[in-house]
């Protein structure tokens, strides 16, 4: 029997802590804890204390972000005749990989579609709120967003109001979610996947790509619609 539990705590007081528990058999389990993206400590604990320790952390404000491993989309790449399209596909894939690695402390294999969905709901709610009249509520939602999927944050205070441009943050957070979503294997229609990859939140990148590679974005979208196998390459 194997058990795994990952707990994190993100607060406005600059806490971005994690507590990871791994059991692979025997009388003890391994604990790895520390601050996200910083040094960690590894210790062993008696297995009989698993539930006690986990419940103790939850009472202190930690959130359970454990998820079943999610396989990323398997590559089914084939040779692309159009050099501009080929370069665009590779650039887009590199762009999404960079966003994910720079933002999150986990990879797509450690994130579930439900986590993505919950994060999207939080972001949508933040986007719909009055930015001037709901500062405290927006900050609470931002903390929940940062907790939903473990991420790299050195100073939590600098990632909430009044230290951020909330409109720019919303755009960036959507970029982050779109990039992570594109790496997950999900049961969505191809058209939805196309729109997810080529949506307005990648507008800045698409404008640069269109200029650099001489690609008409509308034409590219049409090509993707006609040839679904290109989607497996992003």
UniProtKB/Swiss-Prot annotation:
Q: Which domain of life is it from?
A: Viruses
Q: Which InterPro entries match?
A: WGR_domain
Name of the protein described by the UniProt record:
Uncharacterized protein 101L
Q: Which species is this UniProt entry from?
A: Invertebrate iridescent virus 6
């Amino acid at each position: 029997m194997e058990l795994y539990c990952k707990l994190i705590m993100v607060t406005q007081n600059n806490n971005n802590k994690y507590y990871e528990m791994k059991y692979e058999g025997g009388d003890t389990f391994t604990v790895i804890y520390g601050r996200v993206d910083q040094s960690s400590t590894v210790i062993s604990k008696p297995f009989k204390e698993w539930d006690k320790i986990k419940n103790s952390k939850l009472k202190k404000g930690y959130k359970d972000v454990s998820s079943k491993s999610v396989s990323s989309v398997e590559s089914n790449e084939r040779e692309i005749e159009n050099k501009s399209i080929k370069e665009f596909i590779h650039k887009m894939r590199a762009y999404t990989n960079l966003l994910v690695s720079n933002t999150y402390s986990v990879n797509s294999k450690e994130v579930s579609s439900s986590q993505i969905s919950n994060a999207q709901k939080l972001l949508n709610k933040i986007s719909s709120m009055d930015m001037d009249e709901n500062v405290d509520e927006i900050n609470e939602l931002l903390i929940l967003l940062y907790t939903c999927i473990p991420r790299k944050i050195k100073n939590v205070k600098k990632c909430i109001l009044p230290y951020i441009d909330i409109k720019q943050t919303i755009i960036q957070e959507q970029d982050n979610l779109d990039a992570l979503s594109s790496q997950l294997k999900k049961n969505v229609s191809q058209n939805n996947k196309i729109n997810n990859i080529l949506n307005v939140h990648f507008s800045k990148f698409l404008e640069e790509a269109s200029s650099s590679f001489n690609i008409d974005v509308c034409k590219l979208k049409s090509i993707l619609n006609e040839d679904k196998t290109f989607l497996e390459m992003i």
